[in-house]
């Protein structure tokens, strides 16, 4: 899966999970907490949705380090590549 395909899937999930009104605000640099107003519960639900969509496990330690959309994309691509 390409970087852009992963980004589009992550973006779709972020928009759904965080009820983002303006999809243009979901950029690679967007911070879940600061730019997209996600609280800790939102973040947990987002991680669960990403795990389900991409069929991966994201340990709590890793999830805590994923603070932007791009970090999520990079983590997912690394996990998918490692399991291929």
From Swiss-Prot:
Residues bearing O-(pantetheine 4'-phosphoryl)serine?
Answer: 40
The record's Pfam families line, in alphabetical order, gives: PP-binding
Q: Which PROSITE patterns match?
A: CARRIER, PHOSPHOPANTETHEINE
Q: What is its main location?
A: cytoplasm
Residues that span the membrane, as ranges: none
Q: Which residues does the UniProt record annotate as the domain Carrier?
A: 4-80
Keyword Phosphoprotein set for record: yes
Pathway(s): Lipid metabolism; fatty acid biosynthesis
What are the alphabetically sorted keywords of the record? Cytoplasm, Fatty acid biosynthesis, Fatty acid metabolism, Lipid biosynthesis, Lipid metabolism, Phosphopantetheine, Phosphoprotein
One GO term under biological process is:
lipid A biosynthetic process
GO MF entries: acyl binding; acyl carrier activity
InterPro entries listed in its UniProt record: ACP, ACP-like_sf, PP-bd_ACP, Ppantetheine_attach_site
Q: What does this protein do?
A: Carrier of the growing fatty acid chain in fatty acid biosynthesis.
Annotated NCBIfam families? acyl_carrier, PRK00982.1-2, PRK00982.1-3, PRK00982.1-4, PRK00982.1-5
Task: Please report the name of this protein according to its UniProt entry.
Answer: Acyl carrier protein
Instruction: Give the organism the record lists.
Output: Nostoc sp. (strain PCC 7120 / SAG 25.82 / UTEX 2576)
Lineage of producing organism: Bacteria, Bacillati, Cyanobacteriota, Cyanophyceae, Nostocales
